[in-house]
């Protein structure tokens, strides 16, 4: 009843119509405030008169009864809000109801009137709500009619049916109010927290009846529309089970049933107000009124309170919002019946929410008032009907004033509601205005201003309302109620309450007194809602209204009737308002109406002062007064008996309906279950079918099936023939017997028959025999796979054993060579080494070319296309020698390739990309075979290759299987076409071919050992000499004129731009990055012209330069094709890479593809920065801008560029970034800059090992700056910017492709870096600068020319070609050695190929644009290394272009591999450092990485294939560069001394690297070059490259397959891959011994110059980084914990530490980890450490990476999580040992360096190494410091160890993980901790950012890290791998373990 009454009050406007119908009884009561109200009243009066509760005026009802919904009433106005169609529907429905239920005609008519009134009145008063209400009203008409009837029966049925929304609210008002009076029972309607008690309608015919009941009960909160929406459900409570279930059958509704409206939409769950405001308010009011009419009387309290609840509800009206406000509803149930007390209490309490909801709609407050009145009346003991009428009418009357109050209350509520339904604020306001337009509008205006306050207040009131509602237990005490309501409802509600008390004056005339109280209460509400003033105002007004109307509306029937009429009007208005609200247009009208109302109200009452609520009330009151003549109330509770019986019937019906609903529910559930089962079955069946289809579609399977069918057919035929033959034999036998038997005669006919049969059988047999060969061939084709598999299983173990032996031998040789190189680094054996290496490479290249051709032919294109992705992997394996390297660091690169295998493959062979996979594989196998002979030269590569080869074999076998399947299919086709062609022999041939193919891919490894051993012996010596010469001569040359042999190789490299698989080694040897790279390396080594095939191949490779070494065209047969294809591929790849660029730069560390794309992008960006994505462009921007400038300048005048760099021209352009970092924090900046520079330099170093050397020197110098720059992200950015710019310059240099230029440029860069470093550490910088400048200037001279062009790909090619020619050794004197023995690596996505300078030249010339070349010179390596600070490591994106890494110094293939590995790994490590340092700066780092990648790309480009070739060329280039770098660093004054020592140690690394151009040299050089310039590959690619390089190091193969495991990359792996790539690249940088040495010099210089400041800075940075590192470490730990490869890395690291042979194996393990690292950024960090280690180890570890990147990584990762650093370190040290025979020497040296480095530096390392565990790293580093000496030997044994010389660099590196400088710094700090440097690189790549970046945050730690560099390097290394993410996450752990392991 309360609900009803409340609703009546609320809907009073809408209800006015009903009320007016009820006003039939008292038409005079309806004083419509607004014309609409009047009209509604009149209409309703008409209807009332006609239908006065009876079906008197159905015609009247014909008057758009829809108005309730906003139809006729202001339907025109409301039509704006609601569709006329709705009105029509409602009207038709009501008419139908009237006809169907004549006895309810009056009620229905009243409903129609209400609808019409609402349509108009809402327009006038509540346009917002009418629509909403209208919709509900529609249903209300049905349901509400019934409900209302039932309610009206109980509660003044008449008012209910008409006045209180009973009017068609309950559509099924079958009985008149009399029937309603004889309500079948009571229904408790709950909405939100409101519960209202309503008389049960005599009939509940449909769900619409229930909805109408709800709408009438909660007019403000609910509308038919809302209730009909699918998101709203009506639940009925099963008392027996105490559960709610959806009401499906209205017959389930029985007396005392508790119905609940549940809004499934959470947004509306507690936002009743919004919708209430929209139309719920009106609906609720109408419902309330209807209920008030019907149930109201029976439950006066309920009715009275329901209005209150409804007013509250209105705020909660929106079903969603209404839910909370629902309390009014809740009260309805318990409180409603207790309306007076209970409602006051419960409703009030809940009603606080109700008021809230009410506030949503002004009317609700009126209803609330009514509610209060009703409860009062109830309290007074008035009849429910009377109460309801009184409540509704009296309230309406009093509340017409009150109504205005209500309107204001609604207005206020809307304001209150806003709180719940801010969104509905306007709607609520509209509805409020619709309800009480005048006051509402005034209130709305006020409240809109106060709206939110009120809304808040409302919520306050809502909550308070709940509380306050309860307080006024007696609705009679309106003040209490009002206090509560006002509180809850806010001013509007308060006024309504106030009015209600007045209105309730019949029941609560005393309430007039209370209005004051109410006002006070309202004040509390106001206070609650901030609308206290408004509330007070409205309450006061309402008080006035109440005072005025209280007398009028006391218990007088007339007043009550009038109030009911008013309520009807209000209900109609509410409906109209809701309709208007729902149909926007009428809203304005409603507002106008509201304005009118307000005006009227103002005129009528002086309530305008309040929020206008009083006005509305006044207006309504006036209306009520006008219609004061109380419409004869329909039989109030006269029909109570009937009502009860009806209620009981209804209850029984409800029960039945409940049961039916339950049954329906069960049925539906069953249906759903069946559906689900069917779906499941369907899915299963479809899955099975799909599987079957796939199986059938499988070519092998298809062939099998076909063959089997043929075989069965054949057997069937054979069977028949046999049967016939048997029969014939029997027949002949019989004839024979007969012939012998005299008794029988054998006739001639019998004989002829026999002969005929025999002829048939014979023909059949002949046919069968003819068919058999075909069948045989087919079956053999099918079985070939099995045969191959069996053969593989048989032969693989032996192959692996041989590979391991080779790896071990290579490890020994490389160790020896490393010592040799270290000792003879400055001797000048470069030329001899280079010559030998070149010769070796030529041989290898030739073999590779042959193999590639063979493989290409044998493999078959189909297989290629089929196995393209796989090819990348398997190719890595086949190209074990070189590809292993590729696999090791190319895992990262390859990943991009795998993203776009075509990219990598194009470099190798276009078929590779598209269908070349098989060719590259076979080519790889061929290359492997050809490289196998070389393998001896590269023992470690062989060893690594072995491990890698395992993987290779697996991949190859898979490939071969695919290939063989493809071939089998093809052959089958051929056989089918030419059955005769295939005889047993041919089939045997086919099998043999297949076997050969398999063997090519698999046996190649064994072959290399056989062939390889010979080169090994020579190569090591030569390599050593070369390394020494190359480093010395190159460095010297660089110093002298920068025209050391290394510069010339760069030109060849240039020739072999990334597109070509060729990379020029430092020596100038062009290493085919892919197989072709190896071939190219040979050719290049021979000279650009030595092997036309190679050149052709190179060129083809070059063409797809963008496809990193995906398909080295060098395959002779497919050279042209490959060339073209590669060019196409290169273009495609370029496009792809350009696309990738965007993500690439972002994914510098994460995605190999990103890296390649970066490299490619860089190449492209170098040419056109526009191509680079914004982010890339940022990096590239400075990078590219500078690079472009550099390119232009380089192209125009490389020297100019160098001068720029040297003089600061670059600085002017770059300085903004470089100097920025420097200026920001000179020491930090220098470190950061160094770090970045190092990364960039590493990139550039990759592009130009010479440059890298310079870069390293530069980086060393810059490293301090970079480190310091890295102290802050800003410095890091500056550094990155610097790095980017410098990198850009270097990149330009790389682009120029003139190794010399690159070298010079790098040196210049280094000079700049050095200068900058000078700023941070003048001593070191000066030393580095002096050295750098010497080298740089000289190198610049040499490099300037060729390298000028190097910048752009094409320019690069042009320049590169010149320089590469020089690289060929003819190009430049410096590269003489390189020319003779210079090894270049062409690194593509799938392969690492050793190329000769000639090959490189050819490739570069062919694919100038598509190939990135990086010249790595021992001397230059140092410079690049310094420069690496600026141009840390070009991020190599093999995806885009093959990178040719040209080692300017002659070196063994294995040495080259080793150096290459160092290059790559450090880059990655640096990246990891970057990553670690800036978990925060991760993006920046990625940008850095992008720059780095770009630099790498550029460098790669400049180095011709440094990126793709990076893996290989990187090894070799670095191998060659490293000696040079070492030489350069050694030459560095001051720090140079250190560098020399370090270099000697490094030389140790470098020399062995250069000398052992093979594996060790490669590892060492890789390490050193790494530090010089690191190629940043995506982690996976890096891992793959590392693995491949390791394999190459072990096997010395010229072509290594880089298998990138991209699957891992997709998850965190991708990011980790990026990290791994960065990490490895970073590592590569530290591994650049020269650069490390330089960095060490720098660091020592810096340390000496500002060791304290730097240490502090490093420490700070470290600590800063450590925090982020801790997080990163945690993340990494999580990631790593998920990656089993960790253990592998650990094993790798440990093995690495344990023994050189193990080192290769461990390298493999580490490599896998790197692979995983590439796969998993965080986890990959640790693996990357391994990878860098593996890379350092060279190919030796590479095989592992390639072969078991995942497994090993998985293994390592688990343990490596904490041990990654350790193992990584160990691995690096071991690798170093492996690579460096003098690893211990280096270790020893490094030890001193490490000890010399303060513990603080170790912290830097610790952060660096502790990127995984930046903090533990610090402590670990402390322990590591001691350990560094102990570990350093092992570290020294690692390439890092040689790089211990540059531990200072390591520190720098750590700071400039980005640049790779950090590692150098770390190394520099470590001094002897080159491996540490390596580790920092690795860690700096990942972990170092905390440390490396320590330079910025962990700057102090960076120092420590540097100290730790020796021991911590590994730690850092692992953290790097682990640390990329482990930096922040698991790096911490990794570092501790690292420290432990280090110790």
From Swiss-Prot:
Q: Could you tell me where the Pro residues compositional bias lies?
A: 308-328, 1044-1053
Q: Which residues carry this modification: Phosphotyrosine?
A: 244, 393
Assigned GO CC terms: centrosome; cytoplasm
Keywords from UniProt, A to Z, are:
Coiled coil, Cytoplasm, Cytoskeleton, Developmental protein, Glycoprotein, Phosphoprotein
Residue segments, region Disordered: 1-79, 112-177, 290-331, 456-476, 848-874, 1003-1230, 1305-1329, 1352-1377, 1481-1572, 1606-1660, 1677-1943
Phosphothreonine PTM sites in chain numbering: 470
Q: Where is the composition biased (Basic and acidic residues)?
A: 38-47, 1155-1167, 1174-1192, 1305-1318, 1539-1548, 1612-1625, 1763-1775
The coiled-coil segments of this chain are: 557-581, 644-685, 957-985, 1464-1490, 1656-1686
User: What Gene3D superfamilies does this protein map onto?
Assistant: Actin interacting protein 3, C-terminal domain
Biased amino acid composition, Polar residues = 48-62, 1368-1377, 1491-1501, 1512-1533, 1643-1653, 1691-1706, 1731-1747, 1834-1843, 1853-1869, 1906-1943
Glycosylated position list: 357
Q: Which domain of life is it from?
A: Eukaryota
Q: Where are the compositionally biased (Low complexity) regions?
A: 1806-1825, 1892-1905
Residues modified as Phosphoserine are: 169, 361, 365, 474, 526, 809, 1027, 1030, 1033, 1044, 1461, 1739, 1841, 1896, 1899, 1902
Q: For this chain's UniProt record, which GO biological process terms are given?
A: embryonic skeletal system development
Q: Where in the cell is it found?
A: Cytoplasm, Cytoskeleton, Microtubule organizing center, Centrosome; Cytoplasm
How this chain assembles, per its entry, is: Interacts with CPNE4 (via VWFA domain).
Q: What is this protein called?
A: Sickle tail protein homolog
Organism taxonomic ancestry: Eukaryota, Metazoa, Chordata, Craniata, Vertebrata
């Amino acid at each position: 009843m309360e609900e009803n009454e409340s609703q009546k009050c609320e809907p009073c406007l809408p209800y006015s119509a009903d009320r007016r119908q009820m006003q039939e009884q008292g038409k005079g009561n309806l004083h419509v405030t607004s014309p609409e109200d009047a009209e509604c009243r009149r209409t309703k009066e008409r209807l009332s008169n006609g239908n006065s509760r009876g079906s008197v005026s159905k015609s009247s009802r014909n008057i758009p009864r829809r108005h309730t919904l906003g139809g006729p009433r202001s339907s025109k106005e409301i039509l704006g809000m609601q569709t006329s169609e709705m009105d029509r529907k409602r009207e038709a429905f009501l008419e139908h109801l009237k006809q169907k239920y004549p006895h309810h005609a009056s009620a229905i008519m009243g409903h129609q009137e209400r609808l019409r009134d609402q349509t108009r009145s809402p327009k006038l008063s509540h346009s917002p709500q009418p629509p909403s209400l209208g919709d509900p009203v529609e249903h209300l008409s049905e349901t509400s009619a019934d409900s209302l009837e039932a309610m009206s029966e109980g509660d003044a049925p008449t008012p209910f049916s008409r006045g209180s929304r009973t009017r068609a609210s309950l559509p099924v008002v079958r009985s008149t109010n009399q029937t309603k009076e004889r309500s079948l029972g009571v229904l408790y309607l709950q909405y939100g927290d409101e519960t209202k008690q309503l008389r049960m309608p005599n009939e509940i015919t449909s769900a619409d009846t229930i909805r109408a009941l709800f709408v009438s009960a909660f007019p403000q909160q609910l509308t038919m529309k809302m209730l009909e929406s699918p998101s709203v459900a009506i639940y009925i409570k099963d008392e027996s089970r105490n559960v709610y279930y959806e009401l499906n059958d209205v017959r389930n509704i029985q007396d005392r049933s508790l119905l609940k409206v549940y809004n499934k939409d959470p947004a509306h769950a507690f936002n009743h107000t919004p919708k209430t405001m929209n139309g719920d308010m009106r609906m609720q009011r109408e419902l309330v009124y209807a209920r008030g009419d019907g149930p109201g009387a029976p439950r006066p309290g309920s009715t009275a309170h329901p209005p209150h609840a409804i007013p509250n509800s209105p705020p909660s009206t929106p079903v969603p919002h209404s839910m909370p406000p629902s309390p009014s509803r809740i009260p309805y149930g318990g409180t409603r019946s207790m309306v007076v007390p209970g409602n006051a209490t419960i409703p009030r309490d809940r009603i606080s929410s109700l008021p809230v909801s009410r506030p949503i709609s002004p009317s609700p407050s009126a209803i609330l008032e009514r509610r209060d009145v009703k409860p009062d009346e109830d309290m007074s003991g008035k009849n429910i009907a009377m109460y309801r009428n009184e409540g509704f009418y009296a309230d309406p009357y009093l509340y017409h004033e009150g109504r205005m109050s209500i309107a204001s209350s609604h207005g206020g509520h809307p304001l209150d509601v806003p709180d719940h339904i801010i969104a509905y604020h306007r709607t609520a306001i509209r509805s409020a205005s619709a309800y009480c337009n005048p006051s509402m509008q005034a209130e709305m205006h006020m409240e809109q201003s106060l709206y939110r306050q009120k809304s808040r207040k409302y919520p306050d009131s809502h909550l308070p309302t709940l509380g306050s509602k309860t307080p006024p237990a007696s609705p009679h005490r309106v003040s209490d109620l009002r206090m509560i309501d006002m509180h809850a409802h806010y001013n509007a509600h308060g006024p309504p309450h106030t009015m209600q008390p007045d209105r309730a004056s019949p029941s609560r005339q005393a309430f007039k007194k209370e209005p004051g109280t109410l006002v006070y209460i309202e004040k509390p509400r106001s206070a609650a809602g901030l609308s206290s003033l408004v509330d007070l105002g409205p309450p006061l007004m309402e008080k006035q209204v109440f005072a005025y109307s209280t007398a009028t509306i006391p218990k007088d029937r007339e007043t009550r009737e009038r109030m009911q009429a008013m309520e009807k009007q209000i209900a109609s208005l509410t409906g109209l308002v809701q309709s208007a609200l729902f149909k926007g247009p009428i809203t304005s009208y409603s507002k106008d109406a509201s304005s009118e109302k307000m005006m009227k109200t103002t005129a009528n009452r002086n309530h305008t002062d309040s929020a206008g609520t009083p006005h509305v009330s006044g207006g309504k009151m006036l209306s009520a007064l006008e219609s004061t003549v109380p419409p004869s109330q329909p039989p109030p509770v006269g029909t109570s008996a009937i009502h009860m019986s009806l209620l009981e019937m209804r209850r029984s019906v409800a029960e039945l309906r409940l049961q039916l609903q339950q049954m329906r529910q069960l049925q539906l559930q069953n249906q759903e279950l069946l559906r689900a089962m069917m779906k499941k079955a369907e899915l299963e069946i479809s899955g099975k079918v799909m599987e079957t289809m796939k199986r059938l579609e499988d070519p092998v399977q298809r062939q099998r099936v076909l063959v089997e069918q043929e075989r069965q057919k054949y057997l069937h035929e054979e069977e028949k023939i046999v049967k016939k033959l048997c029969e014939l034999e029997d027949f002949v036998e019989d004839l024979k017997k007969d012939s012998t038997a005299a008794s029988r005669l054998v006739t001639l006919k019998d004989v002829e028959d026999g002969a005929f049969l025999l002829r048939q059988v014979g023909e059949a047999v002949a046919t069968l025999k003819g068919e058999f060969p075909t069948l045989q061939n087919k079956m053999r084709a099918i079985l070939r796979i099995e045969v191959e598999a069996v053969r593989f299983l048989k032969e693989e173990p032996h192959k692996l054993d041989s590979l391991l032996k080779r790896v071990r031998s290579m490890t020994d040789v490389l160790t020896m060579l490393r010592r040799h190189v270290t000792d003879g680094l400055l001797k000048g054996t470069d030329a001899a080494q280079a010559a030998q290496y070149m010769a070796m490479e030529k041989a290898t290249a030739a073999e590779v070319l042959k193999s590639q051709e063979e493989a290409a032919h044998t493999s078959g294109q189909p297989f290629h296309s089929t196995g393209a992705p796989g090819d990348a992997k398997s190719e890595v394996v086949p190209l074990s020698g070189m590809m292993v390297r590729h696999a090791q660091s190319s895992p990262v690169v390859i990943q991009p390739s795998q993203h776009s295998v075509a990219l990598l493959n194009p470099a190798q062979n276009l078929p590779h990309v598209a269908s070349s996979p098989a060719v590259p594989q076979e080519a790889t196998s061929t290359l492997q075979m050809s490289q196998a002979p070389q393998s001896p030269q590269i023992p470690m590569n062989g060893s690594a290759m072995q491990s890698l080869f395992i993987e290779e074999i697996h991949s190859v076998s898979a490939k071969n299987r695919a290939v063989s399947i493809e071939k089998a299919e093809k052959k089958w086709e051929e056989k089918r076409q030419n059955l005769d062609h295939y005889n047993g022999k041919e089939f045997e041939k086919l099998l043999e071919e297949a076997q050969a193919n398999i063997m090519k891919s698999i046996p190649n490894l064994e072959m290399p050992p056989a062939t390889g051993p010979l080169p090994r012996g020579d190569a090591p010596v030569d390599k050593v000499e070369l390394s020494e010469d190359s480093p010395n001569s190159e460095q010297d040359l660089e110093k002298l004129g920068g025209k050391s042999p290394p510069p010339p190789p760069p030109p060849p490299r240039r020739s072999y731009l990334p597109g070509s698989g060729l990379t020029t080694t430092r020596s100038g040897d062009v290493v085919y990055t892919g197989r072709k790279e190896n071939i190219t390396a040979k050719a290049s080594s021979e000279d650009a012209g030595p092997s036309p095939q190679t050149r052709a191949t190179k060129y083809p490779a070059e063409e797809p330069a963008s496809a990193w070494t995906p398909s080295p065209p060098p395959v002779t047969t497919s050279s042209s094709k490959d060339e073209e294809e590669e060019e196409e591929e290169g273009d495609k790849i370029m496009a792809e890479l350009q696309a990738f660029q965007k993500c690439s730069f972002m994914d510098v560390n994460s995605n190999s593809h990103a890296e390649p794309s970066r490299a490619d992008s860089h190449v492209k960006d170098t040419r056109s920065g526009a191509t680079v994505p914004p982010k890339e462009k940022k990096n590239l921007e400075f990078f590219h801008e500078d690079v472009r400038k550099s390119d232009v300048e380089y192209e125009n005048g490389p020297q100019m560029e160098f001068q720029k760099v040297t003089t600061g021209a670059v600085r002017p352009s770059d300085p903004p970034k470089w100097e920025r970092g420097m200026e920001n924090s000179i020491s930090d900046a220098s470190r950061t800059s160094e770090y970045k520079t190092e990364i960039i330099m590493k990139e550039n170093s990759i592009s130009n090992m010479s440059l890298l050397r310079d870069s390293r020197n530069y980086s060393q110098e810059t490293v301090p700056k970079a480190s310091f720059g890295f102290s802050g992200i800003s410095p890091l950015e500056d550094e990155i910017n610097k790095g980017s710019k410098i990198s850009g310059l270097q990149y330009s240099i790389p682009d120029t492709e003139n190794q010399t230029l690159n070298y010079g440029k790098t040196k210049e860069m280094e000079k700049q870096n050095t200068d900058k470093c000078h700023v941070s550490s003048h001593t070191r910088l000066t030393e580095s600068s002096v050295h750098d400048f010497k080298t740089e200037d000289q190198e610049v001279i040499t490099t300037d020319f060729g390298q000028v062009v190097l910048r752009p790909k094409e320019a690069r090619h042009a320049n590169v070609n010149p320089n590469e020619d020089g690289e060929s050794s003819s190009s430049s004197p410096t590269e003489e050695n390189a020319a003779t023995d210079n090894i270049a690596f062409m690194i593509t996505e799938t392969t690492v190929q050793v190329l000769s300078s000639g090959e490189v030249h050819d490739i570069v010339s062919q694919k100038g644009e598509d190939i990135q070349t990086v010249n790595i010179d021992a001397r230059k390596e140092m410079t690049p290394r310094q420069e690496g600070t600026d141009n840390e490591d070009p991020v190599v994106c093999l995806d885009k272009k093959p990178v040719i890494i040209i080692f300017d110094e002659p070196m063994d293939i294995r040495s080259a591999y080793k150096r290459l590995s160092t290059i790559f790994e450090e880059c990655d490590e640096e990246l990891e450092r970057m990553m670690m340092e800036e978990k925060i700066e991760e993006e920046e780092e990625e940008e850095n990485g992008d720059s780095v990648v770009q630099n790498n790309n550029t460098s790669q480009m400049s180095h011709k294939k440094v990126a793709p070739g990076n893996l290989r060329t990187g090894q070799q280039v670095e191998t060659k560069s490293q000696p040079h770098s070492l030489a350069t660093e050694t030459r560095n004054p001051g720090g140079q001394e250190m560098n020399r020592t370090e270099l000697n140690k490094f030389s140790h690394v470098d020399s062995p690297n250069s000398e052992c151009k093979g594996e060790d040299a490669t590892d060492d050089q890789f390490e050193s070059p790494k530090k010089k310039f690191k190629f940043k590959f995506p982690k996976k690619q890096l891992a793959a490259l590392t693995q491949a390089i390791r394999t190459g190091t072990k096997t010395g193969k010229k072509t290594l397959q880089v298998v990138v495991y991209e699957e891992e990359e997709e998850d965190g792996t991708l990011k980790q891959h990026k990290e791994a790539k960065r990490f490895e690249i970073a590592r590569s940088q530290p591994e650049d011994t020269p650069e490390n040495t330089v960095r060490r010099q720098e660091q020592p210089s810096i340390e000496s110059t500002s060791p304290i400041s730097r240490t502090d800075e490093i420490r700070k940075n470290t600590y800063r980084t450590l925090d982020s590192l801790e997080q990163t470490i945690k993340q990494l730990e999580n990631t790593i914990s998920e990656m089993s490869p960790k253990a592998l890395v650990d094993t790798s690291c440990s093995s690495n530490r344990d023994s050189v042979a193990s080192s290769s194996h461990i390298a493999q393990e580490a490599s896998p980890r790197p692979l995983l690292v590439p796969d998993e950024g965080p986890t990959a960090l640790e693996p990357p450490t391994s990878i860098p280690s593996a890379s350092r180890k060279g190919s030796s570890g590479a095989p592992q990476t390639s072969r078991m990147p995942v497994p090993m990584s998985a293994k390592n990762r688990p343990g490596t999580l904490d041990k990654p650093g350790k193992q990584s370190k160990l691995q690096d040290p071991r690798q170093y040992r492996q690579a460096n025979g003098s690893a211990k020497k280096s270790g020893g040296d490094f030890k001193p360096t490490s000890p010399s480095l303060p513990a603080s530096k170790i912290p830097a390392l610790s952060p660096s190494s502790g990127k995984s565990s930046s903090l533990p790293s610090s402590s670990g580093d402390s322990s590591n410091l001691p350990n560094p000496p102990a570990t350093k030997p092992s570290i020294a044994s690692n390439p890092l160890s040689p790089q211990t010389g540059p531990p200072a660099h390591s520190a720098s590196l750590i700071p400039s993980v980005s640049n790779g400088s950090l590692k150098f710094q770390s190394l520099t700090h470590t001094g002897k901790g080159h491996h540490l440097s390596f580790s920092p690189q690795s860690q700096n790549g990942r972990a170092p950012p905390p440390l490396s970046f320590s330079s910025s945050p962990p700057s102090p730690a960076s120092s420590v890290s540097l100290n730790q560099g020796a021991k911590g390097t590994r730690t850092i290394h692992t953290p790097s791998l682990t640390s990329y993410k482990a930096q922040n996450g698991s790096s911490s752990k990794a570092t501790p373990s690292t420290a432990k392991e280090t110790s």
